[in-house]
Amino acid sequence: MDANKPSYLGLLNAIALGEGRAHQYLSCWAAKTTDPDVKKVLQTVAIREGEHSHAFTKRLCELGFGVLDRPDPSFDKNMAIANADCSDLEKFEALGFGQREERDPFTKVFDDLTIDIRTGELLGRYIAEERDSGRMLRGCYQVLRERAGRGRGADASARDLSDLHHRLDEICAAIGKLQQEVTALRR
């Protein structure tokens, strides 16, 4: 790697591309929805995504580099979903909402200690806005699920039962370990 080339250029490039593409399909979906509440959320998030794309493109330029286009195999699929003649709830689910949430994808961003101050500020704002956008989209999805009679109640019961089973397994394992320790102490 070039000694003058920042180690985080790939990250900035990926954000610029991903956010620009998200802006496109969310804008398409916002134009197509007939629900004013969904439209408001989608427009807000789409505007943020577009602004992020421009801000990271600008930062790459300030660092003396440009955006390198990389293919995104999911982009055409996401555009087709956004433009589909189906419900907003179906679009959310086709885009992966309702699946088990993964860990926060941003926790490792600042592990690179070479990130300069201006880039760090930009990344910090980006992460805060992405987390907020995620909350907005998940909230919108939940409202649509509740309207469709598939709200939190059913999910909560299944999740609570799963959590209860997991905790019982942990308790049984702890009891087994304690029994072994007591037996060992008696010897």
Q: Which residue ranges define each predicted feature?
A:
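Non-heme di-metal
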Residues: 1-187
